[in-house]
């Protein structure tokens, strides 16, 4: 090898090593609204696995997501505020836990689209703009739905009228819906639900289908009302300053990883709902399928209640979102 090519090779190696030395590892501290053992967090863990694998393949050492824990670290309804302030960088949560700060996020609960379809139709871009303005966070996307909120009861019922007057535990998202069907909504944190059911403080609860065994609530469940309503809107948000620290190619990687994880989460959810129904029926739990007319009353009450709130609290963005997410 002549002297000039040899010098060029040495220079190339030096520049390559310098570039590697300059590549700074971006570290993201993440929390989830539920403990790691809860099924929903499994979708987030899959997302973390996909990110880790892709980073190792394409950008080794440049990005890491450190999972700090669930509500034992920061209470679930305070996590998005913690991300806004930069106490944590990434939050995996659900709409009901920060709807007071971002009312528009409820539109995902009545969305007729899958998460990746929402991105393609511009829903994510609009929600991202809203999140940046209201909570200083970037909206990465929806991760996990297809688990309709379902009414589980400690006593059997025959129809929609039997739900009137019953005290039913719910998240803030479902308060308006339960009032419309004549039930009495009671907002109770998940860890307190079992005791409330056992002591008769409430007659039942609403929860995403397929997930009640995470909390042991199947032991006090006698009846399940069908159909369910809404789609659980579990989402990932990231502190804006932290997002801006992430190079564009790694931002793209995170978005693509979220979309892949969302597709896997959909099938995982469909399988889960089927398995729960089979297991509960074997335990003697009664599934009550409302007649078509009553089922329509139930779903109409659910969707109109939530859209009423969204449109009232967000007259500028609510109509846009409704048009986007309605097929």
Predicted regions and their residues:
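Bacterial N-terminal signal peptides that target proteins for export
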Residues: 1-8
């Amino acid at each position: 090898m002549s002297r000039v090519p040899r010098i060029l090779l040495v220079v190339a190696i030096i520049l390559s090593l310098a570039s590697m030395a300059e590549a700074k590892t971006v570290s993201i501290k993440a929390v989830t609204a539920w403990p790691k053992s809860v099924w929903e967090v499994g979708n987030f863990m899959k997302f973390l696995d996909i990110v880790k694998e892709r980073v190792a393949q394409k950008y080794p050492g440049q990005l890491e997501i450190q999972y700090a824990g669930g509500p034992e670290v920061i209470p679930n309804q305070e996590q998005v505020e913690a991300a806004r302030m930069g106490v944590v960088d990434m939050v995996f949560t659900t709409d009901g836990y920060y709807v007071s700060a971002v009312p528009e996020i409820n539109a995902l609960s009545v969305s007729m689209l899958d998460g990746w379809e929402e991105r393609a139709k511009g829903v994510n871009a609009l929600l991202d703009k809203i999140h940046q303005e209201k909570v200083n966070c970037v909206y990465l996307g929806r991760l996990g739905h297809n688990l309709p909120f379902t009414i589980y009861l400690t006593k059997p019922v025959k129809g929609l009228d039997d739900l009137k007057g019953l005290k039913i535990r719910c998240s803030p998202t479902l308060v308006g819906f339960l009032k419309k069907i004549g039930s009495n909504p009671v907002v109770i944190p998940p860890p307190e639900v079992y005791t409330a059911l056992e002591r008769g403080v409430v007659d039942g609860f609403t929860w995403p289908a397929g997930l009640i065994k995470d909390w042991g609530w199947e032991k006090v469940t006698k009846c399940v009302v069908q159909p369910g309503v809404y789609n659980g809107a579990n989402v990932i948000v990231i502190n804006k300053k932290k997002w801006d620290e992430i190079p564009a190619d790694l931002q793209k990687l995170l978005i693509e990883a979220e979309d892949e994880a969302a597709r896997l989460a959909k099938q995982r959810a469909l399988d889960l709902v089927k398995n729960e129904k089979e297991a509960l029926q074997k335990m003697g739990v009664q599934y009550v399928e409302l007649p078509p007319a009553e089922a329509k009353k139930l779903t109409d009450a659910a969707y109109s209640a939530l859209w009423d709130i969204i449109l009232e609290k967000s007259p500028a963005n609510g109509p846009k979102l409704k048009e986007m997410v309605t097929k």
